[in-house]
Amino acid sequence: MENTEKFTNNKQIINFLTEQFPLCFTAANNPAKPLKIGIFQDLAVRLENEERVSKTQLRGALRQYTLSWRYLHCIKVSEKRVDLDGNEGDAVSAEHAEHALKTLKESKDKVFAKQKKVQKEAAPAKAAKQVNVPKRTEKKELKKESSVDLSNYKEATHSELALKQTVKVLLGKSPVSAVVVEISKDDIQVELASGMMVKVKAKHLIV
């Protein structure tokens, strides 16, 4: 029986697009390709009978995909844009390449500024109360994560998060891996690799 359960977040829709159109949309561990101008209209036609995703959801997922650092990195002058079947079309213009570079810089600056703010806010709390100091093995784990390539991540939004979703928490000196365990109206509770439970705002998570 065909699965008609509706998608509930952008991540599911993007994964669906990479499966349906692998020559156009690429998974997070592969380089992205510049998309054809007007790709949304092509998607709307191809997925007209797809009950699991609405046009509104499709537009939101497409926006998240094209605003990811990985995608913005691929928008370079003369790179060929592709359609849903991977056929090359027009080249990326200098104007579009410049806009992508500007958007990428602004996005990175925003994430790193929030990371610094979290570090600054966490410092007094740490001085006042020591909470579950990680063992040496855990410290090594966190240290290893400091070299994580953030180009595949973007700031999370509350509505896109799902239970058991793997995320990165902007906590301390580097993003820390965590799993979403509870979603409330204002906060997101995550479980760190050390087993510690932390409540944060969605703006302190990247996906």
UniProtKB/Swiss-Prot annotation:
SUPFAM superfamilies: FinO-like. The keyword Transport does not apply. It comes from the Bacteria. Gene3D superfamilies: ProQ/FinO domain. GO terms for molecular function: RNA strand annealing activity; RNA strand-exchange activity. Keywords: Chaperone, Cytoplasm, RNA-binding. GO terms for biological process: post-transcriptional regulation of gene expression. Its main location: cytoplasm. It is found in: Cytoplasm. Pfam families: ProQ, ProQ_C. GO terms for cellular component: cytosol. RNA chaperone with significant RNA binding, RNA strand exchange and RNA duplexing activities. Belongs to the ProQ family. NCBIfam families: PRK04950.1. This is RNA chaperone ProQ.
